[in-house]
Amino acid sequence: MIDTHLHILPGVDDGPETIQESLALAQALVQESIHSAIVTPHYNDEFPPRSAAEIQERVNVLQQELERYNIPLRLFVGHEALIRPGLVEDIQAGRLATLNHSRYLLLELWYSTWLPETERVIFELQGYGIVPVIAHPERYRAIQKDPARLAALVRQGALAQLTTSSLIGMQGNTARHCAEVLLKRGLIHCMASDAHGLQRRPPGVLLGLQRASALLGQGHVYQMTEKCPASIVNNEVFNFAQPNKRF
């Protein structure tokens, strides 16, 4: 599996605090069959701003430590950007990193409210050639209440990324139910760990993928864990399936 959403850099957000914790998380990810991962620290007002260049430098340092300890996990740079106007300017200025410097941007929505500018921000990103990848849509209250909201964003050209552990209830039963609904309706394009550590939000990848396979079959899971993520890492256009219109 290629993990496209991961908090593993030490001391930058609510992920690991030390390099030792980062290495332990990396080892756990490898044991759960993840061979490559895009590092996506939070890009919001809650944590100190760190430019794309700084994140790349920190990724390089962690990659060297992984190689030193023979942990076979390949890292790429990215951010998880909280939605707001002005993200295009942040990308242009080098403040915000897309996923492995590609056309794809990991975009986080507000959990409890629906930002009125959501569709406009996505439209602005697309106008600049950016494809938004909506992070963990199963956890947003508005989408939990009405999955058609996500379907509208997908029809607008956005992609959606599910957290594997949501499928086994690690984000709560409401998120688990929503995750299954979104999968069945064809609204999920890739799956990721969104791991933050071994204690706080551990990976839960293998069990989540087993549940996804039971719902959709291994072929669909392969699309969401290898083919789609590989297209993102390699900055390639991928022919994503259209959502099931049975709403």
Predicted features, each with a name:
Residues M1-N70:
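An N-terminally biased module of ancient metal coordination in phosphate/nucleic-acid-related enzymes
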Residues I2-T4, I38-T40, F76-H79, V133-A135, ...:
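Active-site neighborhood of phospho(di)ester-bond hydrolases with catalytic His/Asp-centered motifs
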Residues V30, Q126, L183-K184:
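Non-catalytic positions within long, well-ordered alpha-helices that form the structural scaffold/packing
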Residues H7-P16, A148-V154, L162-S165:
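Metallo-beta-lactamase
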Residues P48-Q161, N239-F247:
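Extended substrate/RNA-proximal surfaces in nucleic-acid metabolism proteins
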Residues R185-P202:
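Short acidic/histidine-rich active-site segments
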